[in-house]
Amino acid sequence: MSQGVTAPFARHAMAYVLAGGRGSRLMELTDWRAKPAVYFGGKSRIIDFALSNALNSGIRRIAVATQYKAHSLIRHLQRGWNFFRPERNESFDILPASQRVSEEMWYRGTADAVFQNIDIIESYDPKFIVLLAGDHVYKMDYEKMLQQHVEQGADVTVGCLEVPRAEATAFGVMHTDTTDRIISFLEKPADPPAMPGKADKSLVSMGIYVFETKFLLDELRRDAADPNSSHDFGKDIIPYIVKHGKAVAHHFDKSCRRSSSEAVSYWRDVGTVDAYWAANIDLTDIVPELDLYDREWPIWTYGEITPPAKFVHDKEGRRGEAVSSLVSGGCIISGASLRHSLLFTGVRVHSFSHVENTVVLPYADIGRSCRLKNVVIDAEVKLPAGLVVGEDPELDAKRFRRTENGICLITRAMIEKLDA
């Protein structure tokens, strides 16, 4: 056990969230916002899950490193995460890329995004750093990961989970021994190695790391001085520690926050339009795998002040109704029907429209007599009356972004082209 440090270890830790990525596979959803700032689940942004996990785990010092088109993200953090109090030894720092090392360099990689802020980390003097990706959806108790890190005397502890081999090319893939020590680590291999005894599975990194702060800062300084390094945790830092130190795997099953003992371990990289749509629509299930109603592990976010959702008209063929759907505050469903859909704040759906399997981001407006199926509608989009999407694949592909799985993404620019 670390000298002078007692449980709970989270009170001695700083959470450092990497939130600078674009997430280009989300296509036009990230044209004007970073991936961590993309809306999710009716009220939240994707980054709220990592931040809420840190807060619920007992961590009271948090820093968020931003870079790509950060305005939307920074505004959200300032509005929704401004309740930390220095007089209670709490802190919440937003760290935009600001050429702190030289005038020529922004953040050159994930490791450099921490290295350039070493002075800020040292000013708080945390015993541990919990390094997090800000673009995944999951619920996890980081205290349990910290406990394993201390008990096993690791130099780094890496959060991991099993995924199908076909999906593992997008992750760091590891092999472990019987004590969970990592003996090999490959970043995004073209042919991911399988787990022993599980030919169709690979053990992959979740992008969650625990370090003792002094060890991490020493490694970052070593890496920064290496002209051959890409200054990335997955490509450089972790493989180096696996070879020269002690890297340990922490299995997500051990710390996943579940709604019941029978529930599955839920983690999603909502990095494509298909995955994003599916993860949101999953929430309309009777018992979704991701429990947003757990009052003991809430997902904190900016709570915009809105009136309740409203459903009006009760005539045959013009009835405001929703079945198996999530409808946020400020929405008005005026003589329209929703099925298996998720509406964010302030959405308006006009009479005679039918919306199914659709995700509608804040303040979108769906005109009269629209028929929508398997759609993602970006924020503040105004759909014209009579628009039909999800019935003619060829026409959809000409007008909108249509994925391989048949999901259509609609943005304001696409609607403006229809009117041109």
From Swiss-Prot:
It is an enzyme of class 2 (transferase). It comes from the Bacteria. It catalyses: alpha-D-glucose 1-phosphate + ATP + H(+) = ADP-alpha-D-glucose + diphosphate. One of its GO terms (biological process) is glycogen biosynthetic process. Its EC number is 2.7.7.27. The keyword Transferase applies. Pathway: Glycan biosynthesis; glycogen biosynthesis. Disulfide bonds: none annotated. This is Glucose-1-phosphate adenylyltransferase. It comes from Rhodopseudomonas palustris (strain TIE-1). The gene is glgC.
